[in-house]
């Protein structure tokens, strides 16, 4: 029986998403105008925010850009907010969009150097605990200067490379042969060519490293202005530069970093939560042979490319630390320098670098549309008022926990943007002092970054890993990710909240003021546009 037009419409709508999900989104689009016009704009606004969080939580069913975008377009169409308010939000956060467009693309052209470094780590260091710590620390360091998504993308590339090499050799082929590493490794008679126990151990080993690296990106990403997109939004609202941001965060981020490293050591040593998988000797030999094979084939031209990438890496770190230009422009300079000196001049080769970041950049623009609704309908007013009624440390802890809980189910860029906007409005209205605003900005930044490792919904890097082609190969499911992240979630969240609740954050911030490491800012500075930052 031929398909009817209505069946064709439902079939095409949101592609391969489950039918119940499609019906849910269509229901949202029908309910929202009714609530807005006949019940209350405030209620309709909150329902929209919850629907948007639902689309983020269901990111594995359908990329949130389409369902979230439809909700945002409708919100503007029915008058929940205006197109000019959405544009204003995007203008205020232009640096973040530039960071995603140019910085992620720039690092794409430095992948060879990063691949080289991570490959050496696995082949040269035999101790599993030491390799885990190195991956965690290397990811943390890189994420402090690069986008976490990019760091995870590189490590995924390393892991896929290793998996395919082992699969190829174990299937009886040499390094240069073509091979489908996604196959189950059976011969023509349907018998297993691969040692099942060896393969399972190797999968476990790769899972461990990827989870340590993923948490490492959160540990490093929270420390600096460019580590995560929401950090840049918070820094712009507070008018902080690179050095000041890192200093202000350090009373929370430094204890958390040490706690994270200790957790990495303990879960590996005690083999808890699925950690402690060893790299089988036979697999290690294959990987070492491959590394030697690659080193032997590396020409002077290839070596020069690595040297250029290393120099550009030094420029990147220096440019960010000294704030020589806006983050996005430094990213653009990285693209120009690496491609010019490494001879990448083909338009299609350049285009590949932008594929990773642009869908997320478009999604971020949709975030800002929902933020515009929150501002116009004053949705967070009552919640913020309740939090601001508490004094001092209690207020900071409430903001940390509120951000943390929401970041576990929703994207932390969205959560951070909403809360910093509300706190800034309270500052402008004279409800809090400028010094308290600065402390709240630290609580919001750490609250959105640290507890969000709990699920792939909160951390874009985790979601990227879960939706990658590698996840099914190494049997990394949503549930397994949440379970393996659990020890980190508990430790990072508790250490973060203790650093704030104990008064350590306030005491250290006062010490930084007294030693002139940072200065007191005025309310007038916060009113200055982000562009002046």
From Swiss-Prot:
Subcellular localization is given as: Cell inner membrane
Q: Which GO terms describe its cellular component?
A: plasma membrane
Pfam families membership = NhaB
Superkingdom of source: Bacteria
Query: Which reaction is the catalytic activity of this chain?
Result: 2 Na(+)(in) + 3 H(+)(out) = 2 Na(+)(out) + 3 H(+)(in)
Which sequence ranges form a coiled-coil region, renumbered to this chain?
none
The main place the protein resides is membrane
Keywords for the protein's UniProt record, in alphabetical order = Antiport, Cell inner membrane, Cell membrane, Ion transport, Membrane, Sodium, Sodium transport, Transmembrane, Transmembrane helix, Transport
A GO molecular function assigned to this protein is: sodium:proton antiporter activity
Listed transmembrane segments: 10-30, 67-87, 96-116, 131-165, 209-229, 247-267, 310-330, 355-375, 396-416, 454-474, 481-501
What topology does the record note for this protein and the membrane? Multi-pass membrane protein
Q: Which residues form the signal peptide?
A: none
Q: Does the keyword Transport apply?
A: yes
Similarity section: Belongs to the NhaB Na(+)/H(+) (TC 2.A.34) antiporter family.
Name the NCBIfam families on file: NhaB, PRK09547.1
Q: Per its database record, what is this protein's job?
A: Na(+)/H(+) antiporter that extrudes sodium in exchange for external protons.
According to UniProt, the name of this protein is: Na(+)/H(+) antiporter NhaB
Q: Which gene encodes it?
A: nhaB
């Amino acid at each position: 029986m031929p398909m009817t037009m209505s069946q064709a419409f439902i079939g095409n709508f949101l592609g391969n998403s489950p039918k119940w999900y499609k019906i849910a989104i269509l229901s949202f689009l029908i309910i929202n105008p009714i609530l807005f016009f006949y019940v209350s704009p405030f209620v309709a606004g909150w329902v929209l925010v919850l629907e948007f969080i639902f689309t983020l939580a269901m990111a594995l069913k359908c990329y949130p850009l389409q369902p979230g975008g439809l909700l945002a377009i409708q919100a503007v169409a029915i008058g929940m907010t205006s197109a000019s308010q959405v544009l204003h939000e995007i203008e205020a956060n232009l640096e973040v969009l530039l960071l995603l467009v140019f910085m992620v693309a720039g690092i794409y052209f430095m992948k060879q150097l990063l691949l080289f470094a991570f490959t050496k780590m696995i082949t040269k260091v035999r101790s599993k605990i030491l390799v885990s710590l190195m991956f965690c620390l290397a990811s943390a360091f890189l994420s402090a200067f690069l986008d976490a998504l990019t760091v995870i993308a590189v490590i995924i590339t390393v892991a896929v490379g290793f998996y395919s090499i082992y699969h190829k050799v174990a299937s009886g082929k040499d390094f240069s042969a073509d091979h489908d590493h996604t196959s189950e490794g059976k011969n023509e008679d349907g018998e297993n060519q691969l040692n099942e126990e060896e393969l399972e151990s190797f999968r476990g080993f790769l899972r461990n490293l990827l989870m340590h690296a993923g948490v490492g990106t959160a540990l490093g990403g929270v420390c600096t202005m460019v580590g995560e997109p929401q950090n840049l939004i918070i820094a712009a609202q507070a008018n902080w530069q690179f050095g000041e941001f890192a200093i202000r965060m350090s009373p929370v981020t430094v204890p958390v970093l040490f706690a994270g490293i200790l957790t990495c050591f303990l879960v590996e040593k005690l083999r808890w939560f699925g950690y402690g998988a060893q790299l089988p000797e036979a697999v290690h030999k294959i990987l070492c042979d491959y590394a030697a094979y690659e080193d032997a084939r590396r020409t002077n031209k290839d070596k020069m490319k690595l040297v250029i990438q290393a120099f550009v890496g030094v420029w990147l770190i220096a440019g960010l630390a000294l704030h020589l230009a806006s983050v996005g422009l430094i990213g653009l300079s990285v693209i120009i320098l690496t491609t010019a000196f490494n001879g990448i001049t083909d338009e299609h080769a350049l285009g590949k670098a932008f594929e990773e970041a642009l869908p997320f950049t478009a999604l971020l623009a949709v975030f800002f549309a929902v933020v515009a609704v929150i501002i116009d309908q004053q949705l967070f007013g009552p919640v913020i008022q309740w939090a601001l009624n508490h004094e001092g440390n209690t207020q900071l802890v409430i903001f940390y926990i509120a951000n943390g809980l929401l970041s576990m189910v929703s994207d932390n860029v969205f959560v951070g943007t909403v809360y910093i906007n509300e706190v800034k409005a309270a500052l402008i209205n004279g409800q809090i002092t400028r010094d308290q605003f600065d402390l709240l900005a630290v609580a919001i930044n750490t609250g959105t970054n640290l507890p969000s490792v709990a699920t792939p919904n909160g951390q874009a890097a985790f979601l990227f890993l879960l939706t990658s082609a590698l996840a099914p190969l190494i049997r990394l499911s949503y549930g397994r990710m949440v379970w393996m992240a659990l020890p980190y979630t508990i430790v990072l969240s508790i250490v973060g909240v203790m650093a704030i609740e104990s008064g350590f954050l306030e005491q250290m911030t006062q010490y930084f003021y007294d030693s002139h490491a940072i200065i007191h800012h005025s309310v007038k500075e916060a009113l200055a546009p982000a562009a002046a930052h």
